[in-house]
Swiss-Prot record:
Pathway: Carbohydrate biosynthesis; 3-deoxy-D-manno-octulosonate biosynthesis; 3-deoxy-D-manno-octulosonate from D-ribulose 5-phosphate: step 2/3; Bacterial outer membrane biogenesis; lipopolysaccharide biosynthesis. It comes from Shewanella sp. (strain W3-18-1). The gene is kdsA. This is 2-dehydro-3-deoxyphosphooctonate aldolase. It holds the Pfam family DAHP_synth_1. The keyword Transferase applies. The keyword DNA-binding does not apply.
């Protein structure tokens, strides 16, 4: 098995390369907050020498309640992304939910994300593939790791091989997620880069009746476990005031803890990738 390397400017995304951080905020709440959060991430990752991609959503189209905040929408969201990219010289990742969003989003962001709930929607997959952008596929909570090959094949047949696979937890009864650590290793056997969404994996879907609950007190433990697998990247969301975040605050890392948190993740990644592989199948 060979590890596919995805090149994003000077950043190399691969399972055997230093991990890349995909981080930011859950949803764009305001231009000023997005700029402030991006600045913090940029400063911390530059200080620690961690390759970094800024993440945020312009529309949370799958909220539990019709009354929940969704975001500024695509037009305004792309303006904010353009300003972040220009100001901090950062690559960007965001998600799309409709086929018409793919082309205009790909003109601004570097990586387009396929949401977990939509990962089997063929028309959306094809529209995303045809942009030529790098694709981040969130593994659906209801699919086994080996079933990701069908989604990969759809992208390949539509002409796109620049694919990242993202683990974000699996359904465990009602209102709960668990993370199958062996499942991430199984996805790595595809050769494609695998990243771990350590904050969304802390969700309790529907756990607060009209919105998702979460377990951010365990954010460090879960991320440490994932990084021990030797992954291409870590996906996290942070907020300066998680209790008042407009989406997924219960899962968000407090922004002021970002530097210490990432120091630990980098130390684990450096250590694990310094080891010679051991083939215990023989």
């Amino acid at each position: 098995m060979s590890n596919k390397i995805i090149n994003l400017g000077s950043i190399e995304i691969a399972n055997d390369k230093p991990f890349v951080l995909f981080g930011g905020m859950n949803v764009l709440e305001s231009r000023d907050l997005a700029m402030s959060i991006a600045e913090t991430y940029a400063e911390v990752t530059q200080k620690l020498g961690i390759p970094y991609v800024f993440k945020a959503s312009f529309d949370k189209a799958n909220r539990s309640s019709v009354n929940s905040y969704r975001g500024p929408g695509m037009e305004e969201g792309l303006k904010i992304f353009e300003e972040i990219k220009k100001t901090f010289n950062l690559p960007l990742i965001t998600d799309v939910h409709e086929t018409y969003q793919c082309a205009p989003v790909a003109e601004v962001v570097d990586i387009i994300q396929l949401p977990a709930f939509l990962a089997r929607q063929t028309d959306l997959v094809v529209a995303m593939a045809k942009t030529g952008a790098i694709i981040n596929v969130k593994k659906p909570q209801f699919l086994a790791p080996h079933e990701m090959r069908h989604i990969i094949t759809k992208f390949n047949e539509a002409g796109n091989d620049e694919i990242i696979l993202c683990e974000r937890g699996s359904c465990f009864g009602y209102n709960n997620l668990v993370v199958d650590m062996l499942g991430m290793d199984e996805m790595k056997q595809s050769g494609y880069p695998v990243i771990f969404d350590a904050t969304h994996a802390l969700q309790r879907p529907g756990g607060r009746s009209d919105s998702a609950g979460g377990r951010r007190a365990q954010a460090t433990e879960l991320a440490r476990s994932g990084m021990a697998l030797g992954l291409a990247g870590l996906f996290i969301e942070a907020h300066p005031d998680p209790d008042n975040a407009k989406c997924d605050g219960p899962c968000a890392l407090p922004l002021h803890q970002l530097e210490n948190y990432l120091k630990q993740m980098k130390a684990i990644d450096d250590l694990v990738k310094s080891f010679e592989p051991i083939d215990t199948s023989k």
